[in-house]
A protein has these predicted regions:
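Glycine-rich loop(s) and the adjacent beta-strand/alpha-helix scaffold that form part
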Residues: 133-136, 140-211
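Rossmann-like flavin
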Residues: 13-75, 318, 322-333
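Conserved redox-cofactor binding core of oxidoreductases
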Residues: 38-137, 157-158, 208-210, 348-368
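Short Gly/Pro-enriched turn/cap motifs at secondary-structure boundaries
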Residues: 80-85, 175, 219-227, 257-258, ...
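Short acidic, glycine/proline-rich loop/turn micro-motifs
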Residues: 80-82, 158-162, 418-424
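A glycine-rich dinucleotide-binding beta-alpha-beta segment and adjacent secondary-structure elements
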Residues: 117, 322-325, 336-421
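N-terminal glycine-rich dinucleotide-binding loop that anchors FAD/FMN and/or NAD(P) in oxidoreductases
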Residues: 1-21, 337
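An anion/pyrophosphate-binding glycine-rich loop and adjacent beta-alpha core
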Residues: 185-187, 191-329
Length: 426
């Protein structure tokens, strides 16, 4: 958000012009600039409202302040706010809190309702037809209009293959919400609305595959969630060669890997990884230590240590006493991998990445056994980010780029925001 009460109290508010510029640049100009301005102007009060609603249920929602160091390769804007779950991580907690608040205001909720089609009188949307849990058709009449928040289409294999084959290939695990089938988007298209011209997904580089597996061309992988995957440890291709600056926004790592054999790579680290991770000072949900202002991360390092132990038990993460043994267990050419590690250790010792330009404090050595590694191919698919094009009042737009009366679109199924990549550093 921009302009929340917490940001202002922390003296860490974000310049709205910078935020809008950032969004538009990240989408290669596909963002509707005036819509981004609406977000910049209204997001602060929205976050304030959400903070108060969660507080009614005893849930803390806090602003995140992160380090900004000279020489950083990527600009970071402290727009993030996150739920402080404590020991009980469950998205259901926040959903229950919002539902409780809404029902107190008179909201009626009906469950297991599937979108079928919109109904129109002339050009105006007047209601919709849906199916209930008994597979019965239900008509909803709407005198003021219909607001659709049906989610994206990341759970619709046909739509994903048709619109985002590159995202399918870069998916290791699909964490789509159950309703993300594209029903709302299709209903809008049938009613005369238009969709974004470019199609993209939110995919984080946190997928693990077994040491004897590789990514498949044109197909999604079947792996496990490896949350530490976004940490900028040394990453090598199947030839044992370093091929990237490992500190890049989540999906950019997957884009870089797309030009490597079987779009598969290995992430490797040693026994001192907790102190390395703290020094790396990553941002957003990849962060594993408290933020500068004390806001807790989504998952603390202690939780990740347990997750890694489980992945090791399941045969995803391998452990070795020597670098040569690590190469064997990951199926890498021993001589090439050993030379790569020696070179990387040399760069880290000198504090300058002359090969790929990574920040000095995000370099680390592989020097203290035991050593660990994991194969990665594709990531953690959360949702699609393209959708129905909307105006600044959230009206769906028709083929003449005019608002369709009575039809509003919000959430993951709305468009004109993103293209190509998710701006995870905002």
């Amino acid at each position: 958000a921009c302009g929340s009460k917490q940001q202002q109290e922390d003296g860490d508010d974000v310049n709205k012009k910078d935020a809008v510029r950032y969004l538009c640049n990240w989408s290669q100009g596909y963002t509707r600039r005036s819509l981004a301005q609406v977000w910049a102007d209204r997001s602060g009060e929205t976050i304030d409202w959400f903070t108060d609603v969660l507080a009614e249920s005893g849930i803390d929602f806090r602003h995140e302040i992160d380090e900004k160091q000279e020489g950083d390769n990527y600009e970071v804007l402290d727009v993030g706010h996150s739920t402080q779950y404590g020991d009980e991580y469950s998205e259901q907690l926040t959903m229950d809190a919002v539902l409780k608040h809404a029902e107190a205001d008179g909201l009626e909720v009906q469950y297991e309702i599937t979108m079928v089609k919109l109904e129109k009188d002339g050009n105006r949307v007047t209601g919709l037809i849906a199916k209930n849990a008994n597979d019965e058709y239900v008509r909803y009449n709407a005198s003021k209009g219909v607001i659709l928040a049906c989610g994206g289409y990341s759970g619709n294999e046909t739509m994903m293959n048709a619109l985002q084959p590159q995202s399918v290939e870069q998916t290791c695990i699909n964490y789509s919400k159950p309703g993300a089938k594209g029903d709302g988007i299709k209903a809008c298209l049938w009613a005369g609305a238009i969709m974004d011209q470019t199609h993209t997904s939110m995919i984080f580089d946190r997928g693990a595959i077994k040491p004897d597996q590789v990514g498949e061309y044109g197909k999604a992988n079947d792996g496990a969630l490896f949350w530490m995957g976004s940490q900028p440890f040394l990453k090598v291709n199947l030839n044992g060669e370093r091929f990237m600056n490992e500190y890049m926004p989540y999906d950019l790592v997957l884009h870089a890997a797309a030009s490597q054999p079987y779009h598969t790579y290995c992430t490797v680290w040693d026994s001192k990884y907790p102190e390395d991770v703290e020094r790396f000072a990553t941002h957003g949900c990849s962060r594993l230590y408290p933020h500068v202002n004390g806001t807790a991360p989504v998952f603390p390092i202690e939780y990740i240590e347990g997750m890694n132990a489980d992945l090791q038990d399941q045969g995803y993460i391998v452990q070795a006493d020597t670098v040569e043994e690590l190469a064997d267990k990951l199926g890498l050419p021993k001589d090439t991998f050993t030379a790569t590690v020696e070179r990387y250790n040399e760069l880290a010792a000198k504090g300058e990445d002359k090969d790929y330009g990574k920040e000095d404090y995000r370099l680390s050595t592989l020097s203290e056994a035991p050593f660990y590694g994991v194969r990665q191919s594709g990531g953690y698919l959360i949702c699609t980010m393209d959708g129905i094009q909307i105006d600044d009042n959230m009206h769906a737009l028709d083929h003449d780029f005019k608002a369709i009366p009575g039809l509003y679109v919000i959430g993951d199924m709305s468009g004109n925001y993103f293209s190509g990549s998710y701006p995870c550093l905002m």
